[in-house]
C-alpha cells in the first residue's frame, strides 16, 4: 500500500468515526473521533490523544477540537476520566456488555488512562502554532498533572498508582488475572480482546 492510499484509508476511518453534537446532559458541544461506531461509540482519553495527533495530517482544526472536547470534561479537582458518554442514549447497551468503573456521575468513568495528553497538546500546538489553544490547555493540564501527583502517587515515589488494568493501557492483560481473582480463566486458551 502506498502512502496516498494509507492516508486516504486513515482519513476515511477518522472522518467516518467523527462524532459531533451537543450533549443532552450538560448542553456542551462535542467533537471527537470514536474508536468504533458500533463497539466503542464514546470518547476515550488516550484514543483522543492519538486521534488528535493523527488528525494533524488531515484536519488541524478537528485535531484541536478533539483535545478541547476531552479537556472540557476535566473536573474541578483536575481529574480527567478515561471514558466520556457524550451520547447517553448509547450508554445502556454499552454497559450491558462492558464493565466500567463509575462513581457518582453516570456521564463518565471514574478511572483514567495513561496520561499522554500533555504530549498530544504539545504536538498539536507545535503543528498549528495556535497560542490561544496552548493558553487554554495549560491550566487544564497543570490541574490534571497535579491531581495525578496528589491523588495517584500515595507513596510519593513519582510513579502513578494503577487501580485497574485500563489505567495502564493494558486492558485484558493476563498479568492482572491473579489480582482480579481471574486465575481460573488464565489457562483456558481463551483470548479476550
List each model region and its residues.
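Low-complexity, Ser/Thr/Pro/Gly-enriched N-terminal "stalk/linker" regions
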Residues: 1-43, 64-65, 69, 78-83
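The feature captures the catalytic groove of carbohydrate-active enzymes
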Residues: 37-38, 42, 82-116, 122-126, ...
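Charge-dense, low-complexity intrinsically disordered segments
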Residues: 1-4, 38, 57, 135, ...
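Hydrophobic (often cysteine-bearing) scaffold residues that line and stabilize catalytic clefts
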Residues: 47, 113, 137
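Alpha-helical scaffold segments that form or flank carboxylate-/histidine-based iron centers
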Residues: 47-50, 132-134, 143
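Hydrophobic core segments within long, regular secondary-structure runs in both alpha-
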Residues: 3-11, 15, 60-71, 118, ...
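Alpha-helical support elements that line or immediately flank enzyme active sites
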Residues: 47-78
Amino acid at each position: 500500500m502506498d502512502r496516498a492510499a494509507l492516508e486516504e484509508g486513515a482519513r476515511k476511518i477518522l472522518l467516518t468515526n467523527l462524532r459531533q453534537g451537543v450533549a443532552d446532559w450538560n448542553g456542551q458541544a462535542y467533537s471527537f473521533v470514536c474508536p468504533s461506531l458500533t463497539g466503542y461509540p464514546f470518547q476515550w482519553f488516550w484514543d483522543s490523544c492519538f486521534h488528535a495527533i493523527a488528525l494533524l495530517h488531515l484536519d488541524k482544526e478537528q485535531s484541536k477540537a478533539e483535545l478541547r472536547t476531552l479537556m472540557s470534561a476535566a473536573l474541578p479537582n483536575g481529574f480527567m476520566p478515561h471514558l466520556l458518554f457524550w451520547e447517553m442514549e448509547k450508554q445502556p447497551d454499552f454497559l450491558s456488555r462492558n464493565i466500567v468503573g463509575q462513581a457518582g456521575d453516570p456521564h463518565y468513568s471514574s478511572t483514567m488512562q495513561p496520561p499522554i495528553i500533555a504530549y498530544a497538546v504539545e504536538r498539536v500546538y507545535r503543528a498549528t502554532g495556535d497560542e490561544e489553544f496552548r493558553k487554554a490547555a495549560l491550566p487544564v493540564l497543570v490541574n490534571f498533572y497535579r491531581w495525578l501527583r496528589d491523588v495517584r502517587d500515595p507513596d510519593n515515589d513519582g510513579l502513578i498508582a494503577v487501580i485497574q488494568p485500563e489505567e495502564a493501557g493494558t486492558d485484558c492483560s493476563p498479568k492482572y488475572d491473579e489480582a482480579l481473582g481471574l486465575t481460573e480463566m488464565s489457562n483456558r486458551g481463551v483470548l479476550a480482546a
